[in-house]
């Protein structure tokens, strides 16, 4: 079930799953805190939860967590930016404070660029939405004459920033996202594109490990309670290795 980024809807969907008598739930929470009441209901019903990608705040209510090394996903973007701007520069940060995985990405990015001459001009909470990022970036472009780079906690936000940058003819700005989605890789591969890199994860590996973990739980076998998948930079130097037609 897709919650369409609506925490209340997701909680409602989980109650429907409980009523259906499902054996297990794979969960990527819209909001890592607001999901708690639904998790308590699942626990009371004896339904194990395999938490994916974004870790819930109270991990005691889940059976396992399979996700990406989100801090590293942001860190590799910051490291790449330092190579492009060795003297530092002026940057913007687009985040999503309600999603812990995005918070970790931004933390990793800021750790990578600390003490390297970078100034954060402003930050925006765009909830990972392309349209919100687009509208906010248009305002920032009017507000700041000098912007060297933009770090986005999701590729979707980065694509919105890219749209605004392209419309304003500001391709001198370096844009980073995180996820490694096909559309982001397609933009990175374009000659002259301002989208220069993404801290990539592998949903394929997450899904594979999640399925194996669920089977182990249901069959009462041993399993790893926490699995962290590798994250890595995809930029113009290596995007062809990963392709643009699907996820890695």
Question: Could you describe each region identified by the protein language model?
Answer:
Residues 73-80, 101-119, 132, 136, ...:
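Short, solvent-exposed amphipathic alpha-helices that sit
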Residues 1-3, 90-95, 110-131:
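Short beta-strand elements in bilobed, periplasmic/extracellular small-molecule ligand-binding domains
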């Amino acid at each position: 079930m897709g919650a369409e980024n609506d925490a209340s809807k997701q909680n409602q969907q989980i109650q429907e799953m409980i009523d259906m008598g499902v054996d297990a739930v794979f969960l990527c929470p819209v909001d890592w805190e607001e999901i708690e009441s639904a998790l308590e209901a699942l626990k009371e019903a004896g339904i194990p939860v395999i938490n994916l990608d974004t870790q819930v705040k109270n991990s005691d209510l889940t059976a396992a967590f399979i996700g990406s090394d989100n801090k590293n996903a942001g860190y590799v973007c910051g490291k790449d930016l330092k190579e492009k701007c060795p003297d530092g520069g002026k940057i913007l940060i687009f985040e999503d404070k309600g999603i812990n995985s995005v918070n970790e990405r931004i933390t990793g990015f800021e750790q990578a660029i600390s003490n390297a001459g970078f100034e954060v001009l402003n930050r925006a909470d765009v909830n990972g939405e392309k349209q919100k990022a687009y509208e906010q970036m248009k305002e920032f472009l009017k507000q700041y004459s000098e912007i060297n780079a933009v770090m986005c906690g999701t590729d979707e936000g980065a694509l919105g920033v890219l749209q605004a940058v392209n419309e304003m003819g500001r391709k001198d700005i370096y844009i980073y996202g995180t996820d490694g989605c096909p559309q982001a890789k397609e933009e990175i591969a374009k000659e002259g594109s301002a989208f220069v890199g993404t801290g990539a994860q592998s949903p394929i590996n997450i899904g594979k490990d999640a399925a194996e973990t669920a089977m182990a739980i249901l069959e009462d076998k041993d399993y790893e309670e926490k699995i962290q998948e590798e994250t890595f930079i995809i930029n113009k130097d290596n995007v062809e290795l990963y392709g643009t037609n699907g996820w890695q």
